Amino acid sequence: MKFTKMQAYGNDYVYIDAIHQELNNLPELARFVSNRHFAIGSDGMVLICPSDKGDFRMRMFNPDGSEGEMCGNALRSVAKYVYDHRLTDKTELVIETLGGMQKLKLFIEEGNPPGIRREDVVEGHGYAANIQADIGEPRLDTKVIPVAAELPQFVEQPVQVNDRLFHMTAVSWGNPHCAMFVENVSELDVEKYGKSIEYMTELFPNKTNVTFVEFVRRDYLKIREWERGTGETIGCGTGCCTAVVAGVLTNRCDRKVTVEQIGGPLEIEWDEETNHMFMKGPSHTVFEAEIDVSQIM
């Protein structure tokens, strides 16, 4: 099986062209390739598939084999993948996900894409150096997210988690997220609280991604992310967007914010006119290779 390892702010996935390769037993395949000790190692597996609704379809699997609805960093990386591998010449794409149709804009630089061996250079094609994703409007309806609460929206609501009280804001990008502000995010026991909140199914029936946010200034936030089905990751695009939604709704931050993750800063803008959320940043190809998966397939 041919694959490409890519990362965006340290959020690394194994990307597989499922247009030209036939794949089976996907949950087991995701568990296998994601294993950092016995296989490739990643935050999950992403398939690039054909789509009847958009230019391409993205399927994302977590390391535990569960299928996720959306991931902002993976989405941007898919856009880079299809352009850099010359599956398209378009610089504006619509990609189908379980979380909905997503619009992306690619910013092209000349030359061959780093990390991809190319004998021939296509004049004027270049490679995607930066990718902006329009992931649409944040969904705040508790029934949509879902949150088991008798409230139309779940904003800055007090929730006791183990020995600590958090004030949570919940949002969906096609997958459930919640965010809460803390004093010093670098000193927080993210595994302790993140895992407890993820599995708080009496509040989040489908479990949830968890974003811990530290206020630095109105145009700068810091986060740490606990991803549903994955654990702590050093980058999460939708987590950054969730932090900005929570910050704007509680008047802590502006609509255009740099969000610092462990893997690096991501530019986020919640456009007031369209109500759409935009994230912009690079994605990088780490390497390409083949692996024998005959024991799984």
Model regions and ranges:
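Juxtamembrane transmembrane-helix boundary motif
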Residues: 92, 101, 127-161, 165-168, ...
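A glycine-rich beta-to-alpha transition motif near the start of alpha/beta enzyme domains, typified by
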Residues: 1-127, 178-297
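N-terminal, positively charged, Ser/Thr/Ala/Gly-biased leader segments
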Residues: 1-22, 133, 147-171, 297
